[in-house]
Amino acid sequence: MVDIITERLIIRKTAADDWRDIREIWIDFSKSIYAQYDVPHSTDEEDVKQRIARWAQASNNVEHQFFSILLGEKVIGYASFNARENGYEIGYAFNSAYHGRGYAKESLSALLEQFKGHGVSTFFAGTAINNTPSVRLLSSLGFKKVGTEKVSFYKDENGQPIFFDGGIFELRF
């Protein structure tokens, strides 16, 4: 896939050198009230370097594709598209310094159109029902909530899972 250039952004396959900006996104996210609703990411430099190198390598196939979203030279967010039996599941994260400016919608709209142009007609996403900004973003992209599930990524002080309501969203073209 060639780079996608929107009005304000450049979207390209994730490169191993993107690790610094992605680490910054993960450090930023770990301080967010929404961090409790997502799988924790290691922010150790070596761990991040290795993980992003794997992402860059994986992006050479259609099963798992990772995209960096740039404003100028800065990676302000990323998106993942992971093949499922009947479509792709998407994931995304953006540095909070760039929230509320439409960058997520602009970049994800462009990526969804690119995949649609390659014959993909169904997309899935999951987010916590309490993550209002993410739910609002998915809705603005045309996703519909098709279900909910109890999800847990963390345990309490007694080792018991802490559950939250996760929404399952779907977009069909």
What are these model-derived regions, one by one?
Residues 1-32, 66-173:
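Acyl-donor (CoA/ACP) binding surface of acyl/acetyltransferases
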Residues 40-44, 65, 130:
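Short, conserved alpha-helical segments within structured domains
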Residues 53-67, 77:
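A short helix-loop-beta-strand connector motif used in the catalytic cores of GNAT acetyltransferases and
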